[in-house]
Amino acid sequence: MNVGKLQPVRGTRDLLPEECYKFWHIRDVAHDIGERYGFVPVETPIFEFQDVFLKTLGDSSDIIGKEMYSFPDRGGDVLVLRPELTAAVARMLICERLTLPARLFTFGPVFRYERPQKCRQRQFHQINYEHFGAGCTADAELMALAYDILGALNLRSEVQLEINSLGNQDSILGYRNSLLKYFEKHEHALSEDSRRRLQTNPLRILDSKDRGDIAILCGAPVIADFYDDESNMTFNGVMQQLDNLGIPYTVNPRLVRGLDYYCGTVFEFKTTSLGSQDAVIAGGRYDKLVASMGGGDVPAVGFAGGVERLASLAAYSHSTRFSVAFLPLGEEAARCAMRSAYELRGRGIRVLCDGVVEKLKIGLKHADRSGVDLALILGDEEIAKGEVLCRHMDTGLQQTVSISNLGDYVSGMESNAQGNNRAALSSAGE
């Protein structure tokens, strides 16, 4: 096989143990804090019918225009690898007839055909929260949830919350028409992407990272000029709630989201540490999404967080749990080790048992590299006496223990190790 074909596909990558542990830590933090806010876990399939996204994300979105992985199946249907989670969860809400209000948490990979760069891959992972049947008071609550996650990951100092409101459908339509007139006057100076967006959805130009476009945006109209009284009152209410919660924010009048289903409040937690990929957590309100899929009028708000981006910012070191390794020096010792390992695992102990060790010195080196706490040495002499030689890997101290008492001995060692870890964590927090 061609060696090049053994590499991960461009835009994807392998996750080694330390990074897996970090991802799982972020997932567990997100799930734990989500539960405090009443969110329950759900999962949707990795691939869906193409219409789930075509009818919801908008023809003008980059995802629909050039980023979806789509393919026909043998039955003639066009399927896609999910490019985001919100529409998929909304589809599930309708299909499974979930009771409202519904607070749903998801975690998993999504796929977009983008130009790979730092913290932007073609397969990436998201934590995702959707609150269906949510009134406007939920907007600030979702931002508080995100703020708590960032706090648990010690990232609040790394990010800034930016908020805006798109108002209602009349606001968006009026603003869109005003932007169209403004950008048409500057069309010759716009980037190629922005000229394309001018014909599909001029609001998307506000997202441009092109320097020339940014200069033009300085004189563009702002959506606040198109709010009606209700939109003004709603957005002011969201800001008052954030003030009441003590969550710092700035209003960014140019902030829009990249998908057409957004309306009302939108928000992003941004960082300056990841270059152009500055949005770490982002979301907003999408009151018409479920209706656009045939599910009735269901107000909703949600957000997604990029796990790779959070992992790039967060400091995390996995604490290896207490573990032991058997080093049997013969076939009979190996059989005894296998039985003992099975019993220890039944007690919840992490045990490595790889069969006969040809040379004890090599076995000890392997145990040391594996990071185990105890090496349990079994030779003919130990088998004859019904004993195990326990070597403490940190000190080199060796102690003989009867095989019948091995479970209690190792369990006691594990309890002591856990107690020391808790004491160290407590001391570090003082």
Swiss-Prot record:
Organism (species): Anaplasma marginale (strain St. Maries)
Name of protein? Histidine--tRNA ligase
Under InterPro entries, the record lists:
aa-tRNA-synth_II, aa-tRNA-synth_II/BPL/LPL, Anticodon-bd, Anticodon-bd_dom_sf, His-tRNA-ligase, HisRS-like_core, HisRS/HisZ
The family note in this entry says: Belongs to the class-II aminoacyl-tRNA synthetase family.
What the entry lists under Gene3D superfamilies is as follows:
Anticodon-binding domain (3.40.50.800), Bira Bifunctional Protein, Domain 2 (3.30.930.10)
Supply the EC number(s): 6.1.1.21
User: Does the entry feature the keyword Chloroplast, yes or no?
Assistant: no
Q: Specify the signal sequence span.
A: none
Instruction: Tell me the subunit arrangement.
Output: Homodimer.
**Pfam families on file:** HGTP_anticodon, tRNA-synt_His
